[in-house]
Amino acid sequence: IGAAMGALISGYFIIPMIGIKNTINLAVWINLLAAGIAYIYANSQNYIHISEKLLDKSSTTQSNKSSLINTSFSFVIVMIIGFVCLGLETVYVHMLAIVAGNSVYAFSLMLFTFLIGLGLGSELSRQLMVKNINAIYFICMLSIFLSLTIILTLFTWDQIPGYFASFEHFPFIDSFAEREFIRGLVCFLVMFPPAVIIGCLYPTCLQHVSNMARGIKIQAISSAIALNTVGNILGVLIIGFVILPYFGAMNSIILLAYLSFIICIYCIMFHNFKQKIVTLFFIFLIVVAYLNLPKNFNHNRLATGSNVYFKEYNYGEVIAHHESLDGGLTTVHESHMPNDRTIRTLQTNGKFQGTDRSEGEMIPQLGFGLVPLLHTKQRNDALVIGYGTGTTTKILYEAGFENMDVVDISNDIFTLANK
């Protein structure tokens, strides 16, 4: 709850008031304050530090070694859950940046929702485990629900822009607060269900590891936590920098659903519990949902810009697109004029970047390069902030500058603009 509130308050209040650098400094001082309070409290309680010999090498019995072997599959499950958790957060944040907005406010909403879901899921898991529910059956069902939830969300992503556009003629949706509330609602509906399930899975798996590791519980749980963290790191790196850029968001999400499904299959094949008919029914639902998935997202819908303007802008059919963590979704649209002329428009996450229409936005693009030349005769160094379609950069290049630096939010813009 503290982490979730920190994400929300920082994004909407602290960062706008004091800036990013001061917010980071404030976070450091708060951490130091917490450490100081903990140190003072520990000394005030007169804790006696006793070196407890938890497990001597000579006391490691064959039974303990057998327990460690039995927990090996549990370790793999915990690692996969870590991979799915942070991998799913990475790709969901990417998708929500496309359909809900790519700003510090939007990211705060996403992170707040995800953390609240994890916290609620952990508490729900604690209450259920008190009732002595079979841990492996619980893990199996949670994995099924997670896989099903992930697949079902694939049907909703390209419908979200249309939902935002439906508010175009609503008179009361015209302020920042009202629009942020709607964005927050969308983030909640998309991210909260899988976050709750993941929040349930993690402590349940640790409980299962503890049950399996007779005599070596502390070592087993410590190893499980470490492997879960390794899975978190691999999930961010592999999904964010390999799967997403090269295979797209949809395939990334499907891969994570597969991994969750593998956990379920393992539980059914290698463990005995009475409720297998129920699990097979939900597996059937997953298969049906998967077989009805579209081949890809409808990029014409995703790139309408309704998340920015709460109104649809149709620049034609998407003929090229690139996805990445830094740029979200960059698209090139092609439309045909009545005189058989073809117009191409570049957008990033639905936001207009530029067009090749000479009587339209091409004029400002030319002006951004020509007007500064009226005020200087120097042709040494030039900095262009925002590449767009490359028109302004071309003007300055033709003006004869010796050195030019061009910066933009994403390499995808350079890639598509130069095609």
Language-model segments: residues:
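Alpha-helical transmembrane segments of multi-pass membrane proteins
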Residues: 1-419
